[in-house]
Amino acid sequence: MKFKAPAFLMALALTAPMALAAYADSPALPSAATADQVTTSKLVYGLLSDSRYAYRPRALDAATSKDVFKRYLESLDSSKQFFTQADITRFAPFEANIATAIRGGELEPAFQVFAVYKQRVGERVGYARKLLKTDFDFSTDEKFEYDRKDVPWAASSAELDDLWRKSVKNDWLRLKLAGKQPAEIRKTLDKRYATLEKSVNELKGEDVFQFFLNAYTSAVDPHTDYFTPRTAENFNQAMSLSLEGIGAQLQRQDDMVVIREVIAGGPAAVNGTLKPGDRIVGVGQGKSGPLEDVIGWRIDDVVAKIRGKSDTQVRLEFIPAEEGVDGKHHTLVLTRQKVRLAEQAAKGETLTIPAKDGEPARKVGVIKLPTFYQDFEGRRRNAADYASATRDVAKLLAGFKADKLDGVVLDLRNNGGGSLDEAIELTGLFIEQGPVVQVREPVAASPSTATAAKWSRGMARWPC
């Protein structure tokens, strides 16, 4: 089954593009928003409903409330695998009062809806795991529909049972066709379904608040998102291509956080002790003191403990990869430093296009730019070495110029966006001058135009 669980996967380094997971014995999910979340809800409503701040403010009327409600349900159960029509009917009063909930910060219904979702996930996973103890009949002709976005909600639990029976049967068949044996299939699927339930159980109140508030912001403007403080921190680190930590990418395997990669030049690499596959089981602050057992923790919670200000120390309790999960525990003290995430920066390579049909061979430079990154804080402080996509691309172009290439290709595939200023300035590396983007203010009589000019540092333009 293709699950759509709210999630955010941490690629850490203590870097981290978005994920979802938590303590094995996580505390009960809050039934209401915190005071800060209530205030935030009111502020976000004020910004998105005021023409001074929102380009196209949208009133929180019945139509918008219906849209927000739909988006919130989609963020939880987009494939309609957990809720029944009876659940949706039960939520109807919440849909009617969404405007009051957002304007006044009365967010309890959003948490109540999530509590039902969490309960339904537990029920469905329990049913799926029970099915794994039986045998499937593959002699009958049945159809399982993957794309359930436009189908109606299941009329009953019995209808969901049949959906999940077909889904589990389909999952089993796919593994069987891959050459897996029944015992291995049962083990694989049981773990898969248990992981789904665990990931939902580990969600916190701030996650639920983010899901709901983003249902509202996306209904008003599809390009507007609300970030929790931790998500905002991760975004800023991704844009600045740097972080303060030990310089290691982490991943979660079962209940343990494991070193996936040690980043060159970071404290962990300089120390040389940690290796890919090592399991982190405890974290402490400073040279001495208590160590917190982090087995079963959300990966982003472990990251938060390991990250910290430069020149401060963190202690890690870990099990070397070669010793297995029951191996001896070792302790390591590392001093945090600022680590540059060079692998996420612009990269260039030179390709040779062979001669063909009388045309001579050509040397072409290819620049891959994953994002229009910029260290916003570094630029604000006018730091000499702040991360900038434009600066890095300019250096690559200078190298290409010295090699006397015939042309340059700027590869923006998989580029997720980033700083608008960087996008405009980078364009100035390739054109003499001209409009790049128009920006229309909500109260302006006419749009203003952001214009690219030839970059002011003497870089020659290149065809693309």
What are these regions (language model features)?
Residues 1-9:
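Bacterial N-terminal signal peptides that target proteins for export
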Residues 9-19:
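Bacterial N-terminal signal peptides
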Residues 24-33, 51-61, 65, 198-205, ...:
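Cleft-lining beta-strand/loop regions that shape enzyme active-site pockets
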Residues 33-76, 87:
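N-terminal-proximal low-complexity accessory segments that begin disordered
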Residues 40, 44, 60, 64-65, ...:
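Stable alpha-helical elements in mature extracytoplasmic
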Residues 58, 74-75, 96, 110, ...:
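PDZ/PDZ-like domain segments forming the peptide/carboxylate-binding groove
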Residues 60-66, 70-146, 197-252, 313-315, ...:
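Extended, small/polar residue-biased N-terminal targeting/export presequences
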Residues 152, 156, 161-221, 225, ...:
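AAA+ P-loop NTPase catalytic core
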